[in-house]
Amino acid sequence: MKKSDRQNALAVAAVALCFMLTLGLCYFLGGEGFLLAFNQSEGEVKCYLLCGGSYENVTLARNAAELAKSRGGAGYVIVGDVSEVVLAAYASYDDAQSVLDGGSAGTGAYIKEVTVGEIPVDWAPKDMREAAESALGYYDIVFDCLYETANGIAADSLTVADARTRVAVCRARVEEMRSDFSDASAGSDDARCTELKLALVTALALIDNVALSDMYGSAAAVSSLRYQCVQLVLCREALYGVLAG
């Protein structure tokens, strides 16, 4: 066999071995692992929406959403070809799958994958890129606050009063980020810069819309936090489409 042919054969064998190892690992981790390995491109950041079901009739979906809210679920309705009722958003697939496997989401529940990053900043002038990168960090800060606070109340490790304090601190941080980016991008007429500014303003509005009243009880507070968290994820998905598209 010629040296070049032998090298080609070794290369093919190496690729085949890597592929078989990947298949074996995915099989070990579960069937979903194989799909995720090939559907999730390198560098993409996903969020996972736990949906309680889908409905052809939007009225039925909204009725189901109200029931979900009464139990602490987000009860967010995504209207499309079918209407999907979202119960909660998760940064980790394993966390979403764990809840799904637990059965508390219902027999018709499933996981919906949403792409929220990575969002590049190469569209920005060099002297603004660091500020843009910092501003994009609003998402993780707000998501973590809403997610962890909702779980804390649900687990009785946080009171609604505690939640108000945490949310207020989060809002102050995002407001500072908004102000810093506004100063850094002053004079820029780039539409993508404007989109990022709007994303920061929207995040602040979502925080302001969280209903944390002792009057309505902990389930309502948890539901409100999860509802705004789902909205945050969908807004980030839209921003990703603009800045990374």
Question: Where is each model-derived feature located?
Answer:
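Short S/T/G/P-rich N-terminal loop/turn motif that feeds into the first structured element of a domain
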Residues: T22, G33-F34, G137-Y138
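Acidic/histidine-rich, surface-exposed loop or edge segments in extracytoplasmic proteins
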Residues: G43-L49, T149-G152, D208-Y216
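Short, low-complexity patches enriched in S/T/P/G
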Residues: M1-L10
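Alpha-helical segments in soluble extracytoplasmic regions
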Residues: D127-L206
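Short, charge-rich amphipathic segments
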Residues: K2-K3, L25-S41
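Solvent-exposed beta-strand motifs enriched in subsets of small alpha/beta binding domains
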Residues: G33-M128
